[in-house]
């Protein structure tokens, strides 16, 4: 990232990963300015990050978690609904965002199911001050995700995602394929956590790096059905802003 820009950039730390502590330290050593966190509580890293001047923005799936993050020193929170891809909570974006916005004083960023100006404008109406999009940017031309993965997202329809891992307490939304069908079958038959973990070992890499869209984990949100073309990040952001402005200006309440 430093080779690409002299501007501030962010790093996402997945707290369930076994190397999370190592990544947390690298963030400090490399002078990263912004960190977003997911799949866990970043509390044990918060003091060190704040002392290093890092802006910390955790993903939250409940009002209680949002309040906890605010008390812990978070600069903002990402209220992520269950429409999102990857690890998800139990509430929808529509219900979660306004409740979190009412509960905390720090900025709220909406995530989950947002892929265009309509969703972005709706997020602002719900009380968010920004949005986070994953599925939409997965297919950006700058994304290093395998072309097969991108094509699968673009071809996805509104009902093509499903949730695996409910029995483990770590539900994950993915696009339906052979791996997800086998996972759900094993869950239904009462497979152990270890058996399910063995099935998914390395599955995300299979999809993202190797392009195996049959046996890999195709993490993507319900907004995949709205993603129909590839474009550069610059083009995408311009289109999003223009679309959002159009929706807001077209509102009967706009003055």
Task: Identify the meaning behind each predicted range.
Residues 1-107:
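Active-site entrance/lid segments in N-terminal catalytic domains of soluble metabolic enzymes
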Residues 95-109, 115-255:
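Conserved active-site-proximal phosphate/metal-binding subdomains
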